[in-house]
Amino acid sequence: MSALLTHRLALLAKAPHLPLLNQCLHGIERECLRVDAHGHLAMTPHPIALGSALTHPQITTDYSEALLEFITGTDQDPRNTLAELEAIHRFTYAKLGDEYLWSPSMPCPLPSEADIPIAEYGSSNIGRLKHVYRQGLALRYGKTMQCIAGIHYNFSLPEALWPVLQADDGDTRTERDYRSARYIGLIRNFRRYSWLLMYLFGASPALDAGFLRGRPHQLEALDADTLYLPYATSLRMSDLGYQNNAQAGLTPCYDDLSSYTESLYRAVSTPYAPYEAMGIKDAAGNWQQLNTNVLQIENEYYSNIRPKRVTATGERPLQALRARGIQYIEVRCLDINPFLPLGIDLAESRFLDAFLLFCALADSPCLADGECGAATDNFLKVVKEGRRPGLQLQRCGEAVPLGEWAGQLLDEIAEVAALLDRSHGDSRHAEALAEQRAKVADSSLTPSARVLEQLRTNGESFSQFAMRQTLAHADYFRSQAPSADELQQFETAARQSLERQAAMEATDTLDFDSFVADYQRSLSL
């Protein structure tokens, strides 16, 4: 373990500082497709009983009208975060009728591209902007890729911790700039080590054969309806034969916040010739993308982790980051575990806390020449063949066996987990870490291996397995209907969200073309 990490852990172990570690904040976003009783994509509108997808704080849609997204608030205790996520699931199932929530990350058998419904958000300008943005995604990348679901894990260190660390570092920057620099350091370490998360939690080694729509690929056929790779952990996070040339040069190496925001600003303000050839509007004059830039908006940039700041009404993410710095990070590379009703559990959450705190406290120099590329290569190697016996990764220009490096990382993360346990007065982070050690010792315990074992043992296709898990989880949630109080709270939130959407639609005065022009201009102000 580095001297710096040892020093920082000793600092935080002191009596005045140790309780601060209880104040890390967590939030979870879980996406899932609505499907019918046959395991096919639901072609119905977003259920009105769930409220407005535009304005509801907890239940919205992602790309497709059928791709639900559940959003928890933030809490210091991940048990509360998961309890809130479960309550959202139970309410949703109380209103879903004969539809279901698809269990894994990779989608059910999909209809033709043209028939995948894009999410609708009503007639307000902001609602139309969200819809046109999604039309642009369809135009640029196709609809099929947008139907993949995942878990997003939001995490922040306690605000009171930053002055302690800054004073210890002897750093003279403003607290805002110091905090942002340290979060960027966390992100650099995440880039170095996130392959470990793919090995431990990747759960998409197989997919429905129709997903690739006849594109060339390097996958193997498990049966007539299933494609897979024998040692894959997360095909969701691989390229799957899809290339994104526009974003190819966009991977920032996260030297500092200003270089990150500058890179993103260039992407949302620089035209890209192939998109210019498509045009903003189609031949009939209908909007088909917001603009012809490399990115229509900041969130189009596809990354495994994002620096984040809560935005004010009408404020864009870049403006918020520039004005007030980084507030938290969003981990975006986590597969949904199809063996878990929520797709994530407490053990995973507690390990993520220890892992992310390790990334924040460990030494994190800027990624040197070649290190940025090596981090990307390691990640892609693990998602495609992470369970291959003897697999080697690149570390500091040298080959190292995955198992050896994973063991060394877990030894260091164990010290962070022990500190978290001292702060909480229990041993739950150490127990979560022990579960991950077992997976490194025996790859058959990983979710990806367990998925393939189920397919082979039961002679099931991917979609048959997925529907079996979907039905089991539906039974779980429907057997625990919301209490009368919960039902009333969710129904009130749904009704209020519909009222907010109606009010927005009634008060819009600007025409949509002018609204989009103002939105584009807002970044240069």
From Swiss-Prot:
Record-level GO BP terms: glutathione biosynthetic process
Phylogenetic lineage: Bacteria, Pseudomonadati, Pseudomonadota, Gammaproteobacteria, Pseudomonadales
UniProt catalytic activity: L-cysteine + L-glutamate + ATP = gamma-L-glutamyl-L-cysteine + ADP + phosphate + H(+)
A Pfam match: Glu_cys_ligase
Pathway: Sulfur metabolism; glutathione biosynthesis; glutathione from L-cysteine and L-glutamate: step 1/2
HAMAP family the UniProt entry points to: Glu_cys_ligase
Cross-referenced InterPro entries: Gln_synth/guanido_kin_cat_dom, Glu_cys_ligase, Glut_cys_ligase
Swiss-Prot/TrEMBL keywords: ATP-binding, Glutathione biosynthesis, Ligase, Nucleotide-binding
GO molecular function (one): metal ion binding
Enzyme kind, highest EC tier: ligase
Superkingdom, taxonomy of origin: Bacteria
Biological source species: Stutzerimonas stutzeri (strain A1501)
Segments passing through the bilayer: none
Family membership: Belongs to the glutamate--cysteine ligase type 1 family. Type 1 subfamily.
EC number: 6.3.2.2
A cellular-component GO term for this protein: cytosol
Name of the protein in question: Glutamate--cysteine ligase
